[in-house]
Structure formats: C-alpha cells, structure tokens
Swiss-Prot record:
Gene behind this protein: nuoN
Protein name in the entry: NADH-quinone oxidoreductase subunit N
Subunit structure: NDH-1 is composed of 13 different subunits. Subunits NuoA, H, J, K, L, M, N constitute the membrane sector of the complex.
Classification via InterPro entries: NADH-Q_OxRdtase_suN/2, ND/Mrp_TM
EC number of this enzyme: 7.1.1.-
Subcellular location: Cell inner membrane
Main location, first listed in the record: membrane
Annotated source species: Shigella boydii serotype 18 (strain CDC 3083-94 / BS512)
GO BP annotations, alphabetical order: ATP synthesis coupled electron transport
Length: 485
C-alpha cells in the first residue's frame, strides 16, 4: 500500500515522538547533558501534542490495516502525551540528585510513550501486542532505575517476570482467537464472530487468556499482586507513568476492541468481567485501608479505579454513554493521579535514596508548605469522588451507565467501594493538617511552585477544581471522539 501525505499527517504524533527518540539517542552519544536531553524530550512531546490539531484536520482514516486514526485515537494519544510530559517534568529535579546516568531515563519514557500512542491507534491484535510490549519493555528499566536501592531492583525483577508471563498468556490467547476466526483485525473479528460463534470453546479459551494478559497490565484482581510492590519500589516519577499513561493506553485499546468485536455479547465473558470488576473494587479499597505508605496506598487505589472503569466497559453494548463515561473518568483519574504523584515526586526530589512515601512524611505539611498541602487535599478529594471535583464527574457517569445497563450489583459495589475509599483518602488529607513532628524527615524545596514540576501540579489541581464545577469543556472533547469511530 502507498502512504499518502494525508496518511503522514495522521501519523504525526507517532512520527514526532519516534524522531525525538532518535534525536535524544544521538544527543546522548554526542555529549551527556542532562538539561539538554530533558529539554529535547519535552519539546518533542509538546510538538506531538500540538500536532494533534493537524491530525484532527485530516479526519478519520485507516492509515494501515494495523492502525486507525480517529477522534478516539486522538483523545487517548493526548492523554498519554500529557502523562509522559508530566513524568519528564517530575523526573528532572529528582534526577538532579542522581549520581548515575540520568539521560537514559528520558529515552525510556519516550519509547514507552511511543508504545502508548501505538495502542491508542491500534485496530488489530498485532498492533495491540506490539504497543503493549513497546510500553512494557522500557518500564522494566524505569522501575529499576534507582538500581542501588534493593527495593527498586526487586520491583523491576518482579514486574519483568510477571509481565513476561502475562504477555505469553496474551499472545497464546490471540493465537486461539485467530485459529477460530481466521483474522486479527478488530473490524474483521466483529464480522466473523457472528451469533453463536462466541460460545465456541476455543474462542472462549482465547478471550479468557487475553483477559488474563490484559488483566495483569491493568492490575485487576486477581492479577494485581505486583502493583503495590512495584509502585512502592519504583521512583516516584516512574510510578506516575505506571499509574497514568500505561493504564490509559491499554484501557483505550481494550475499549476499541470491545466496540468493534462483540466480545461483550458473550454471557460467559460478561460474567467473568463482572466478577473481576467487583473483586477489584472491593479488594483494592479494603487493602488500601491499612496502608501507611502513600505509594502503596495509591497502588491499591488504582486497582479499584480500574474496577470502576470495567463497569463502564461491561455496559458498553447499552449505548454511547459508556464511551463518554470512560473518557471522562480517565481524564479525571489522569489529572488527580498526576497531582498526587507530583506531590510525592516534589517531596522526594532531588534523589536522596528512598522516596518520601511514608504517610508520616506528610504529617503537618500544611504548616510549612500550605499550598502543597492544599493541592494534595484536592487530589485526595477528587480520587475519592467528592462533588465539586473532576473525580466526582467520572464516578457519577460510571454510576449512571451501570444503572442504565441494570448492573445493580456492580452499582452497589461502586457505592460501597467509594464509601470505603473515602476513609483512607481522608486519612491522608487529615494527616496534612496535624501538628508537624519536631524533626520532619523529607520536605519539598521552598520555591517548589516556581519549578516546572510545581507548575504541572498546580495546573492539575486547577483543572480538577474547574472541570469539577464546569465539566462541559471536557465532556465536549470526549464527545468529539465518538462520532469518528
């Protein structure tokens, strides 16, 4: 097939990030300069973000049999690029105190972002697998970047081994689906998997194994065991990327698969997904209750958030509102997580051994860093789904979609899970306003709000509050992504 100029415009974000990877690689080979390579990475990601406007002008199209560029792809590409930008911004002050090679960090983030963009545009099981591997492989290095710390190295080894096992399940499941359907394209799967075919044992086994592989990547129960350890062991900026870009890109491609291929039409698959969603919501929230480490707490919290999103995915066949719910929820989750992990990154920078991830480190933060404490409070309230924050809009949509689809026991799980979550989110928020210890451990720099990371955290807090009160701009953007499907 011939690639036209129109096709190249549609692929601009992918091409720009790919070019940035090459430029940063050559820059590292020429001369190691932390500031230069960080700047090149941020410029490349910003250029990719701006290029989405030109992609929108080009309109929806199938660029190759493996990739479809449309409003849906643009929305998820934008979210992945924003998360990658925030990760690079938080990493810069953290790496300033890091004595080993700094520059490769940005290279790995860019390659992972490339995988995220590929997933957002994937229209075929082959590009789905390539995208997942492209986002996972750099994360093995990023999680273990602080390799002189035993916990970071342990997290990296754990994530690598379990991720390899999950990829094996995913690939074998795809092979079984291909054996039964004769095609790997999402659209062709939708056409080939007619009435009754979804109950074929081979096909059910294939989709079952794919659920295992994707469930691991999304840290859904019972494939979640790596999550708290990896979140705790990874450097704070890497945990930011793991919690946001990685989850958003993979959930986006699963959403597209469910839209084109009638996977959710199978009663057996719907029941399995409903059980996974229920277990993720309840277990994730219950396990977070007893955590005194803020990164572990946010790790368990992410399990429950993916459970909430799964409710909207199960209800996908009932109407377009599910797509709106997922888009709105993921945007709220992105900004809330960027703010929360951003505060942890600011408190942990520059690198001085383990991160400031103990809840005790944040005790009395309000009395010497009042604005930072206020930002963290807003993020906790948003993650809890309190009204007047963006997190509430997403949770409201998920509940509305669940009610519309008559998924009553999952709606009940969302309500109970949110009530449990309120306790541990408020526990973090309250500790910020207690009396500070006489000898505080870690602290953010006094001028944190003037740093790039501080500005990102403040913008995230502002968006969470403004879009929580007036969500119409966000809803309009999410709706733009739907007619182009």
């Amino acid at each position: 097939m011939t690639i036209t100029p129109q096709n190249l415009i549609a692929l601009l974000p992918l091409l720009i990030v790919g070019l940035t990877v090459v430029v940063v690689m050559l820059s590292i080979a020429w001369r190691r300069n932390h500031f230069l390579n960080a700047t090149l990475s941020v410029i490349g990601l910003n250029a990719a973000l701006v290029s989405l406007w030109f992609v929108g002008q080009a309109g929806a199209m199938d660029v190759t049999p493996l990739m479809r560029v449309d409003g849906f792809a643009m929305l998820y590409t934008g979210l992945v690029l924003l998360a990658s930008l925030a990760t690079c911004t938080f990493a810069y002050p953290w790496l300033e105190g890091y004595n080993d090679n700094k520059d490769e960090f940005y290279l790995l983030v860019l390659i992972a972002a490339l995988g995220g963009i590929l997933l957002a545009n994937a229209n075929h099981l082959a590009s789905l697998f390539l995208g997942i591997e492209l986002i996972s492989l750099p994360l093995f290095g990023l999680v273990g970047y602080a390799f002189r710390q035993k916990r970071s190295l342990e997290a990296s080894i754990k994530y690598t081994i379990l991720s390899a096992a999950a990829s094996s399940f995913l690939l074998f499941g795809m092979a079984l689906v291909y054996a039964q359907s004769g095609d790997l394209s999402f659209v062709a799967l939708g056409k080939n998997l007619g009435d009754g075919m979804l109950n074929e044992p081979l096909l059910l086994a294939g989709f079952g194994m794919m659920i295992v592989g994707l469930g691991f990547k999304l840290s859904l129960v019972p494939f979640h065991l790596w999550t708290p350890d990896v979140y705790q062991g990874a450097p704070a900026p890497v945990s930011t990327f793991l919690a946001t870009a990685s989850k958003i890109a993979i959930f986006g491609v699963v959403m597209r698969l469910f839209l084109y291929a009638p996977v959710g039409d199978s009663e057996a698959i719907r029941v399995v997904l409903a059980i996974i969603a229920f277990a993720s919501i309840i277990f994730g929230n219950l396990m977070a209750l007893s955590q005194t480490n803020i990164k572990r707490l946010l790790g368990y919290s992410s399990i429950s958030h993916l459970g909430y999103l799964l409710v909207a995915l199960i209800a996908l066949q009932t109407g377009e509102m599910s797509m709106e719910a997922v888009g709105g929820y993921l945007a709220g989750y992105l900004f809330s997580s960027l703010g929360a992990f951003g505060v942890v990154s600011l408190m942990s920078s520059p690198y001085r051994g383990p991160d400031a991830d103990s809840l005790f480190s944040y005790r009395g933060l309000f009395w010497h860093r009042p604005i930072l404490a206020a930002v963290m409070t807003v993020m906790m309230l948003s993650l809890a789904g309190i009204p007047m924050t963006l997190g509430f809009i997403g949770k409201f949509y998920v509940l509305a979609v669940g009610v519309q689809a008559h998924l009553w026991w999952l709606v009940g799980a969302v309500v109970v899970g949110s009530a449990i979550g309120l306790y541990y989110y408020l526990r973090v928020a309250v500790s910020l306003y207690l009396h500070a210890p006489e000898q505080p451990g870690r602290d953010a720099p006094s001028n944190w709000q003037y740093s790039a990371g501080g500005i990102v955290v403040l913008i995230s807090a502002l968006l969470v509050l403004v879009l929580g009160v007036w969500p119409q701009p966000l809803i309009s953007i999410v709706r733009l992504a739907m007619p182009l499907m």
